[in-house]
Amino acid sequence: LFDAVRSDFLRYGYGGYAVEQKSDGAFVGFTGFHNFSFDVDFAPGIEIAWRLKQEYWNRGYATEAAKACLDYAKENLPFTTVWAFTALPNKPSQRVMQKIGMEFEKNFMHPSVTDGHPLKEHVLYKSLL
């Protein structure tokens, strides 16, 4: 994982940023940007994503970190559109997308998920920087 994050920073100047707990510096997870390209009508693009340790879910870390990433991108990064997507059942992640001001675009069937799988259907959100 470290090599992939490092590679994105070297290639694009952005990637996943470590999220730490303010009180003690404990590692919470990652939030940041990822280039994506798969067979959908909104690709290629830049995704904002968050991956946190489960013990830190539902405590505001993803929202705070994602807002900080979007603010940073507006001033410092070379793109103007950011996407976020998640499986339809992942309501907590959808709430983060809404809280950081992203707009719902549509539902779509993720081409990398097997047909018939319960996580095949995804929701797509968009933010213009």
Located regions from the model:
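Acyl-donor (CoA/ACP) binding surface of acyl/acetyltransferases
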Residues: 18-129
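Active-site rim helix/loop that mediates acceptor-substrate recognition in acyltransferases
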Residues: 1-13
